[in-house]
Regions:
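Eukaryotic scaffold repeat domains enriched in small/polar residues
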Residues: 1-301
Length: 301
């Protein structure tokens, strides 16, 4: 019998070999993952060759694109209109069709923006239904940017620190919830902060372990990938638990939480770096650093 993870209505089995086959025996460094409206899966792989890998829901490789554009691919977000936003730590945000046509490049590859301005190693970009684009920026500075649909800067906020509205390193992911709050993963401070879309601090969920990514399903349930304790070039990562996944409601009430370090299916040998929930409630977790893989968690109903 397969091991199960989670609890209550949020119980899952895991397919730890999803996506592997003759064409792709193993994944490289899986930096980002997202699904489109048909539940096709888009895996942004940084190594050995930066590229977007596109899969069927069953895990069959359909297409690759972006090989000549990405340098240090990091995050991907796909909107309901079928447009993908990708971030690259080479200081760019790119906008794509889902078949790999490049629509726009914001920022200049290899050149960080001025201090406080876009971009300095951005980590995640996402678009609201109104067309505004929010960018977690990122590894090179402690900022969140609000851009219009043409990529023009409207507002920025954030400084280094531990107080409300301040950020630790790095500012890693963003998502707008059904209440109109911008959720920002403040990885270095072990929390997800909440803001208005104009940058006013509203509150936070502080009971997290180095949160890397946040994603919401169609019901407004919140899924968070937590890296847990470890170390980086900037020093130790202090976290009370993880690596793992936490599922909560919009009030921060934990619905399910699990995770432990290891190589077995459902465990995390390194850092859960990216997460996305599909229309059926299944979700994908990409890992980076010492152990590169993608696991699919299948919801039991």
């Amino acid at each position: 019998m397969s091991a199960s993870f989670g609890s209550g209505s949020y119980t899952y089995t895991v397919d730890a070999t999803w996506g592997r086959g003759p064409e792709l025996p193993s994944f490289g460094l899986v930096s980002g993952v997202a699904c489109d409206s048909q539940d096709r899966v888009y895996v942004l792989q940084r190594e050995p060759q930066p590229a977007m890998l596109v899969f069927s829901p069953e895990g069959r490789l359909l297409q690759t694109w972006g090989e000549q554009v990405f340098r240090m691919a990091h995050g991907v977000w796909i909107g309901p209109d079928g447009v993908a936003f990708c971030t690259d730590r080479a200081h760019t945000v790119t906008k794509w069709t889902l078949d790999g046509t490049l629509l726009a490049t914001w920022g200049k590859a290899g050149e960080p923006g001025p201090p406080g301005q876009p971009f300095n190693e951005p980590a995640r970009a996402m678009q609201t239904p109104a067309g505004d684009v929010f960018v977690a920026d990122g590894y090179g500075q402690y900022r969140v940017h609000r851009l219009n649909a043409d990529g023009e800067l409207q507002r920025s906020w954030g400084v280094e620190g531990t107080g409300p509205g301040q950020f630790g390193w790095p500012v890693h992911s963003v998502w707008v919830d059904p209440r109109g709050r911008l959720l920002v993963t403040d990885r270095g401070n072990n929390r997800v902060q909440h803001f208005t879309l104009d940058g006013e601090y509203l509150g936070e969920w502080a009971n997290l372990g180095s949160p890397n990514d946040v994603c919401l399903d169609s019901e407004g349930t919140v899924y968070i990938a937590e890296g847990g304790p470890g170390s980086t070039s900037r020093g130790p990562i202090v976290a009370s638990h993880g690596p793992g996944v936490t599922i909560m409601d919009l009030d921060g009430q934990i619905l399910a939480r699990w995770g432990e370090r290891g190589d077995a299916p459902g465990q995390f040998a390194a850092s859960p770096h990216s997460l996305w929930v599909d229309s059926r409630g299944d979700f994908y977790v990409g890992e980076v650093t010492t152990h590169n893989r993608l696991q699919k968690f299948i919801r039991q109903r």
